Regions:
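Conserved core of the PLP fold type I
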Residues: 67-208, 212, 218-220
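N-terminal small-domain helix-loop-helix segment of the aminotransferase-like
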Residues: 2-106
Length: 221
């Protein structure tokens, strides 16, 4: 008999940003005269820039011609795109990596969940607090987060980011297998220095841990 993954039933509710959207819409209905400044999900607010529009038109024209039409792309992404990423995002910062280390995906949210497929379910995890909810939810859905009680998961190590510590988390006081870091941080906006990040790398090396680093907002710095 096919059985449902019981860990889905442990999730406390729907996706956080969906709940926020419902509350915002309800407020707009009851307060139509008020202007709402959304600080929820980071949706776009401006139209596409000319360079992006030009590239999309060019790609569409290529797909419309038998001579230049192409089907599925390579499983890791097109070489020209991976090489451009290395050139502009890594070599420009003095970082040398091999093209085999670059994968083209469909966003951080998808791969945050996809990483779970290659890591054991009983690895321990550490997250900054507050944190982007997908990091925890994706682990909860495979049973790695434990039991949800009083707003906390029993098997998750929470690393407080408060005004008292300038929103900079301390290293865990015990071994953690998987560490989620996002800097510039969502939602605090904090940026860690190279020296502060080095502490995390050293911790990971000393404890045979993995750092899952989300650099979604690196362009801000």
């Amino acid at each position: 008999m096919a059985l449902i993954n019981e860990h889905f039933l442990k999730l406390p509710g729907s996706y956080l940003f969906a709940d926020i959207a419902k509350k915002v819409n309800a407020y707009k209905v009851s307060h139509p005269q008020q202007r709402v400044i959304s600080l929820g999900i980071g949706d776009v607010t401006q139209p596409l820039c000319p360079a992006v529009i030009e590239a999309m038109h060019k790609a569409t024209d290529e797909m419309a011609s038998k001579a230049s039409f192409r089907g599925y792309g390579p499983e890791r992404g097109y070489d020209f795109l991976r090489e451009a990423i290395i050139k502009h995002d890594y070599l420009s910062r003095g970082v040398h990596i091999d093209p085999s280390e670059v994968f083209i995906n469909d966003g951080a949210k998808s791969d945050t969940g996809n990483f779970q497929e290659i890591l054991r379910w009983d690895n321990s995890i550490g997250v900054t607090d507050p944190v982007y909810p997908v990091y925890i939810d994706s682990n909860a859905m495979i049973g790695r987060a434990g039991v949800y009680e009083a707003g906390r998961w029993s098997s998750v190590t929470y690393l407080p980011c408060t005004a008292e510590n300038n929103f900079i988390p301390s290293l865990p006081n015990h071994r953690v297998d998987m560490i989620y870091l996002c800097y510039p941080n969502n939602p605090t906006g904090t940026v860690l220095t190279k020296e502060e990040l080095t502490k995390w790398v050293n911790y990971a090396l000393e404890n045979d841990a993995i750092i899952l680093y989300d650099a979604a907002y690196q362009a801000y710095i």
